């Protein structure tokens, strides 16, 4: 795990994080199943492994389960936004992780959505991609967005993250990352993608995301270029 910048005060519930110590995840079956599927631990241990485990040993071998991609958490502090001269200058990279163990160590030490203030933004993007329209990989892309009440926000954010790091999207190479926006008018989760012109890929991502979260309402895809020029008047390019 790489600490890419000093953590912003207040975002982490415990900033003294040991990447080799993993806090137990939420006991929800779907989360446990997702992690087992990623790590390849679905099968029960063999008898041989059980025999080894039963022997007394002073040495503990810890096995890390690597993701296909490394990911970085970013944070945008609402108090800094009001003072920024250039858009995005208040963005701060927090931590970069590449294993299941590092992910849970970080996730379980981030304050839950109920403790966040309006105007804050949390990002989880593939490493080396900055969550900005100006980033070369994001520049020609767009985003799918869903609105959630506080009661279901944390669960849907976690499921979105697990789908991303677990490479559960057929068009996963098209995805840049996910954004969690805390707003007075409604909290929102968005998926940023690379190529808005690739209609087939965008529709596939939107449909799969809805299925993964069991989301029944229509969602829309906004092109970044349209959002830059038209702001809230930007029209949906695609809907599913």
Curated annotation (Swiss-Prot):
Bias type Basic and acidic residues, positions: 39-51
UniProt keyword RNA-binding, yes or no: yes
UniProt main location, coarse: nucleus
Pfam families per the UniProt record, alphabetical: IF4E (PF01652)
Annotated TM spans: none
GO molecular function: RNA binding; translation initiation factor activity
Gene Ontology CC terms: cytoplasm; nucleus
Family, per entry: Belongs to the eukaryotic initiation factor 4E family.
Chain intervals for the UniProt region annotation (Disordered): 1-51
Localisation per UniProt entry: Nucleus; Cytoplasm
Biased composition (Polar residues): 17-26
Name under which the protein is recorded: Eukaryotic translation initiation factor 4E-3
Residues where mRNA binds: 83-88, 115, 133-134, 183-188, 228-232
Organism: Arabidopsis thaliana
Subunit structure: EIF4F is a multi-subunit complex, the composition of which varies with external and internal environmental conditions. It is composed of at least EIF4A, EIF4E and EIF4G. EIF4E is also known to interact with other partners. In higher plants two isoforms of EIF4F have been identified, named isoform EIF4F and isoform EIF(iso)4F. Isoform EIF4F has subunits p220 and p26, whereas isoform EIF(iso)4F has subunits p82 and p28.
Domain of life according to the entry: Eukaryota
Chain positions covered by the region annotation EIF4G-binding: 65-68, 75-111, 159-168
Cysteines engaged in disulfide bonds, as pairs: 138-176
Keywords associated with the record: Cytoplasm, Disulfide bond, Initiation factor, Nucleus, Protein biosynthesis, RNA-binding, Translation regulation
A biological process from GO: response to virus
Modifications the protein undergoes after translation, according to the UniProt entry: According to the redox status, the Cys-138-Cys-176 disulfide bridge may have a role in regulating protein function by affecting its ability to bind capped mRNA.
Function recorded in the entry: Component of the protein complex eIF4F, which is involved in the recognition of the mRNA cap, ATP-dependent unwinding of 5'-terminal secondary structure and recruitment of mRNA to the ribosome. Recognizes and binds the 7-methylguanosine-containing mRNA cap during an early step in the initiation of protein synthesis and facilitates ribosome binding by inducing the unwinding of the mRNAs secondary structures.
């Amino acid at each position: 795990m790489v600490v890419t910048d000093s953590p912003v005060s207040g975002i982490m519930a415990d900033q003294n994080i040991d990447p080799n110590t993993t806090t137990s995840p939420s006991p929800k079956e779907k989360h446990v199943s997702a992690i087992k599927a990623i790590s390849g631990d679905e099968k029960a241990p063999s008898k041989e492994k059980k025999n080894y485990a039963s022997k007394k040993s002073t040495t503990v071998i810890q096995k890390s389960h690597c993701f296909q991609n490394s990911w970085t958490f970013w944070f945008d502090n609402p108090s800094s936004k009001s003072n920024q001269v250039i858009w995005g200058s208040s963005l701060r990279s927090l931590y970069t992780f590449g294993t299941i163990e590092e992910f849970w160590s970080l996730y379980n030490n981030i304050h839950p959505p109920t403790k966040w203030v309006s105007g804050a933004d949390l990002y989880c993007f593939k490493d080396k991609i900055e969550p900005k329209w100006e980033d070369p990989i994001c520049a020609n892309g767009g985003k799918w967005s869903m609105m959630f009440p506080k009661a279901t926000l944390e669960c849907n954010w976690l499921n979105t993250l697990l789908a991303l790091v677990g490479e559960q999207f057929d068009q996963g190479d098209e995805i840049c990352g996910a954004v969690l926006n805390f707003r007075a008018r409604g909290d929102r989760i968005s998926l940023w993608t690379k190529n808005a012109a690739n209609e087939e890929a965008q529709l596939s991502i939107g449909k799969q995301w809805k299925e993964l979260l069991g989301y029944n309402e229509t969602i829309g895809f906004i092109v970044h270029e349209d959002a830059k020029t038209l702001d809230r008047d930007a029209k949906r390019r695609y809907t599913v």
